[in-house]
């Protein structure tokens, strides 16, 4: 009997070692990603002025886009042509809206679930993430089961982001800024690192996990900005379980000159262990747009999604900005791509 027990324990230890080896091998297979940021472009003759805040790929050249100030609840259909070799956007147009006669919920994030032919949209009004039919934009009556404690956000600082990955079958979202139950939020007069909660939901729309995420310290030195925002604008779920997080800092002085938007794309791996305070972050890339002298490429990027793969196998990340309806005829509805290898 003792020999049988010892043999069983030995076999169990071998199996555990093999399993641990598999885990380690899987972790090492997640190689570091690199990125190239393409030039931003805009198409004023074919893309109407908007407050575009989220984007998701439907396949081919089709994308669904949400606006946080659309007249009705629903989404726009965009056609975006991308060069298969460079990933640069060559043309884009939008001439269709799908939705119904409900008021807009300050729609911010959007995700496509192909197996169900449905769209999920996060709205900061009520902090609910509702499901819509792709063919007509009507609500299905289903929504992600967000715990009440995570819906209690500061005004206009709720669920700005949303992503779904068909391989992992997981939804991801995070509040734009710190939840009241977690303390103070970063402002131009109270500079601090925002401590956020990255939330995960399964394909049955149920909440499954939360992960601590700590933003960078702001780069703005002044405390007198006329307009300021510091938070996570969007997330993008990758096939290997990692998540790209868009940290966005925006500053607009009273005289407008010197305005900037600083965007940082970080990669986090929720499956990693060993973190003490928050998930480990790896900077993928960063870029800055400004209004400075004669230069004006100011773009408040709020949405991003995975797009097609290029001929060389590189992954395209598509980004869209909020021009506030091309405010003062100065801002533009920019699109841009980031090529990930």
Where are each of the predicted segments found?
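Bacterial Sec-dependent N-terminal signal peptides
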Residues: 1-25
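Sequence/structural signature of beta-propeller domains
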Residues: 20-341
């Amino acid at each position: 009997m003792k020999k049988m027990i010892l043999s069983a324990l030995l076999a169990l230890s071998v199996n555990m070692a093999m399993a641990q080896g598999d885990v380690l091998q899987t972790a090492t297979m997640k190689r570091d990603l690199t990125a190239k940021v393409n030039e931003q472009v805009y198409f004023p003759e074919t893309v109407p002025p908007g407050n575009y805040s989220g984007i998701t790929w439907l396949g081919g050249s089709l994308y669904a886009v949400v606006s946080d100030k659309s007249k009705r609840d629903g989404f726009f259909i965009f056609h975006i042509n991308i060069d298969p070799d460079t990933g640069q956007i060559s043309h884009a147009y939008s001439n269709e809206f799908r939705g119904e006669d409900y008021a807009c919920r300050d729609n911010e994030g959007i995700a496509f679930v192909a197996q169900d032919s449905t769209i999920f949209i996060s709205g900061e009004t009520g902090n609910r993430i509702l499901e819509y039919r792709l063919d007509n934009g009507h609500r299905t009556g289903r929504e992600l089961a967000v715990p009440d404690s995570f819906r209690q956000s500061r005004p206009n600082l709720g669920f700005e982001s949303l992503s779904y990955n068909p391989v992992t079958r997981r939804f991801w979202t995070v509040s734009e800024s710190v939840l009241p139950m977690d303390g103070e939020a970063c402002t131009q007069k109270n500079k601090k690192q925002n401590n956020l909660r990255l939330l995960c939901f399964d394909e049955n729309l149920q909440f499954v996990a939360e992960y601590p995420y700590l933003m960078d310290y702001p780069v703005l030195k002044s405390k007198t900005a006329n307009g300021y925002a510091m938070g996570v604008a969007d997330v993008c779920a990758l096939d290997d379980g990692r998540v790209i997080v868009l940290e966005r800092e925006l500053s607009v002085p009273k005289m407008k000159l010197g305005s900037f938007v600083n965007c940082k794309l970080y990669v986090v791996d929720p499956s990693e262990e060993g973190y003490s305070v928050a998930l480990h972050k790896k900077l993928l890339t960063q870029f800055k747009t400004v209004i400075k002298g004669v230069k004006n490429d100011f773009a408040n990027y709020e949405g991003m999604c995975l797009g097609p793969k290029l001929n060389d196998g590189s992954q395209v990340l598509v980004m869209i900005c909020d021009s506030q309806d091309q405010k003062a005829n100065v801002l533009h509805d920019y699109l841009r791509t980031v090529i990930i290898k």
